[in-house]
Amino acid sequence: MSGGVAQGAPRVGSIFGSRHLWRRLDEVQRLDRGRRLLENLHRTVVRLPTGGHNEAMTAILGLNAYHGDAAAALVIDGELVAAVEEERFTRIKHCAGFPALAAAWCLTEAGIGPAELDNIAISRDSRANAGHKLWWVIRHGANGRYLKARLANAARVRDVRSTFAGATGIEPEALRAKLHHVEHHQAHVASAFFVSPFEHAAVLSVDGFGDFTSMMLAQGEGSSFRVLDRVLFPHSLGMFYTALTQWLGFPKYGEEGKVMGLASYGDPCFLERMRELVVLDGDLFRLSLEYFAHEDGVDMTWHGQTPTIGRLFSDRLVETFGPPREPRSEITAQHENVAASLQAMLEDAYLHVVRMLWERTRIPNLCLAGGVALNAIANGRVLPETPFDELFIQPAAGDAGTAVGAAFWVWNQHLGRPRSFVMNHAYTGPAYSEAECAAAIASAGLEGERLDDDRLFAEIAERISMGDIVGWFQGRMEFGPRALGNRSILVDPRRAEIKDILNARVKHREPFRPFAPSILAEATAEWYEQDYPSPFMLLVYKTRAGKRERIPAVNHVDDTGRLQTVERRVNPRYWRLIKEFEKLTGVPLVLNTSFNESEPIVMTPQHAVETFTKTEMDILVLGNHVVRSGAACRVASEAVASAGVARP
């Protein structure tokens, strides 16, 4: 963003000068690690610039609130300035509720106050599809408790203006921003098309549900899109996948990705049974509702910190596939085969709709969003198996991304402003200075060394090649569920044993889940059967036959990888590290997994230090500061001594 943002910054007090936000932060303080969060936010306030509001500037705050993956995004004059999930602050995965801390950080990052916002957009509109909702209630009745919960959630959404004012410490009357309720799937569509590189595109949004819709098909032209079709409640590919995910013993919100990994171990021998659950009906699809419970009302909690969803499958599904697996119990061949069949059915239905969308638009460009668009296996089949030539997937394809979409819906669709922004990276979160990194290391009682770039990249590439586990913390944090080289744990992909070591010492996750490669973009065609850019780790490609044995740690059981292609112009530091590794090993890729252990991806240097100290990583890199532990420290010291180089 241009310097106009800093020039238009207000006084510090205009953002944080009241008791209301600090009362909210006091609530966070009662959470684990809340003290450090408060320290970080207080420190951020001190850094705010001063000045007056730039009257020519148009500032739009987008919110995903009262739903899983609560998030905020700030768009100023058509440019995405900041976007971040609430979970990164609260340290609660998929944090629901109102994203007060995420919104406050976005404003702080831009140096503006809540009173200077022109528009606030929330990716929910309880009025959307009102006629369909009423007709459904008349025909089916409604579970009283379920209906009460949905009405309460709708009331919270409608009251977002006063909630935001209270959270940010101003009177509602002082909030001059116009409030926009953007239909959930229109926000998804906007999040994909308006930030894509395409002037014209077909757009598909697929998830569980939002505003009574589970799928939206649209056509984007310039600075607007038109809705072509939609699938309404109770039919939903996302709900189908989540229901079977629950049956497979993964009941927590957001565990569908585990099933995608498990599916590769099974045989889709139950595919014909799955076709009884999902019927490809003409252009779209429908569910056989006797296998599901959500039509009758399922308890869902969105207003607290942790989102929850009640049981979505019916007794009929249990009769078909047997008793559901208990969480953390043994996974059998039956479970693997059901997972494989579930994934195959999802892919068939997904591609069926994609092909139909091409027939209706005949546009070569496709944009994808919605939680189902996080299914990288299905995405990887789109270009080879449909007529589309080009593809853009919103990096935060799940509901967090609707914060971005809601803001751009206002800028482009509502205000009619021309498009000027392309989301070619997802590094939109907080960044920290070298001094802050050093302070975090010192406050933990650790010894760190600051290296210049040449020494840093050479040493870390060498340590990775020698089998060390490296925590890599650089620049602005990623937005969305994937670590893309700024909040990552990196290891050598050539070592088959490193997966088990990584799980035992750091990640502690299920052994069937694959680890992903980050590869130099220019080397993709040499190592994988497809080479279309995959910057957000949302495409699965087959590994070339001659390369599989060389990178066993990132070659899944079905000879695939969910890869991130790394371009020098997008992330030069990450690209350089991988390039140094290639010089040492001849392999232009590293294993990249998210920098966390059973919690959200680390945001601050303090989070990174804490994860480093409670796990068994070998090296922590915060900017140019290196912390070595145990054997890694001894090996580094011996290398320095043998080279005759004095340690600073």
Please report, for each region that a protein language model flagged, where it lies by residue:
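Extreme N-terminal starter segment of soluble prokaryotic enzymes
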Residues: 57-60
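Adenine-nucleotide phosphate-binding core of ATP-dependent small-molecule kinases
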Residues: 327-353
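Flexible beta->alpha loop and helix N-cap segments adjacent to enzyme active/binding sites
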Residues: 66-85, 90-93, 136, 143-146, ...
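Short glycine-rich phosphate-binding loop at a beta-alpha junction
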Residues: 114-125, 179, 362-370
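Intrinsic low-complexity, disordered N-terminal segments enriched in polar/charged/small residues
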Residues: 27, 38-40
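N-terminal phosphate-binding loop and adjacent alpha-helix
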Residues: 88-112, 350
